[in-house]
Amino acid sequence: MLDMGQDRPIDGSGAPGADDTRVEVQPPAQWVLDLIEASPIASVVSDPRLADNPLIAINQAFTDLTGYSEEECVGRNCRFLAGSGTEPWLTDKIRQGVREHKPVLVEILNYKKDGTPFRNAVLVAPIYDDDDELLYFLGSQVEVDDDQPNMGMARRERAAEMLKTLSPRQLEVTTLVASGLRNKEVAARLGLSEKTVKMHRGLVMEKLNLKTSADLVRIAVEAGI
């Protein structure tokens, strides 16, 4: 993932990690860590209320994929994954999603800490509070094999098939969760109790064999909902 800021240009020098602009961030709440910590998918959370939308949390899978430690990432915008080959039109698509507070999924060229380029299937999605105010952005990354150009399509088809196993109510809950709403707001939108929403989310996670809400959001966006 890269450049979840507004319109600040990426470094573009071809030297991964060259942009070391950093802001001070406070430790995130436990529920933010719970969102991504156990996910096998490389995931991060950023705070758009702070200057330059810096990362406030990453998981171990992100370190395993990119080579960057938590200490090297927190407080920085994700543009440090960009380099000379990063496609500017795809960067613009991510920025547009951030500006409009809409989920966006692109396959973009990024660079690991050691300079290795990789095709990155990047998801960026908003997270709202109970008053429908933007809190954070969730980002997740999956390395795509350039030798398998249809891999992205296969993931989308698989995600769509997974969602077909859900009941209509479970699909409604999943759709609202993927849009960034938390349980209280989902409950209000559907006229359900918060306890019932939590029950449906739990059943969805179990049925789809997912570990975290971040994984659920990615599946939903990949499926096109």
Curated annotation (Swiss-Prot):
Domain HTH luxR-type: 159-224
Gene3D superfamilies documented for this protein: PAS domain, Winged helix-like DNA-binding domain superfamily/Winged helix DNA-binding domain
Residue numbers bearing the S-4a-FMN cysteine modification: C78
Keywords (A to Z) from UniProt: Chromophore, DNA-binding, Flavoprotein, FMN, Nucleotide-binding, Transcription, Transcription regulation
Domain PAS: from-to ranges: 51-77
NCBIfam families per the UniProt record, alphabetical: sensory_box
Comment block on domains: Light induces structural changes; in the dark protein is compact and resistant to exogenous protease, in the light protein is less compact while protease treatment generates an N-terminal fragment corresponding to approximately residues 14-156 (the LOV domain).
Name this protein carries in UniProt: Light-activated DNA-binding protein EL222
Organism: Erythrobacter litoralis (strain HTCC2594)
Lineage: Bacteria, Pseudomonadati, Pseudomonadota, Alphaproteobacteria, Sphingomonadales
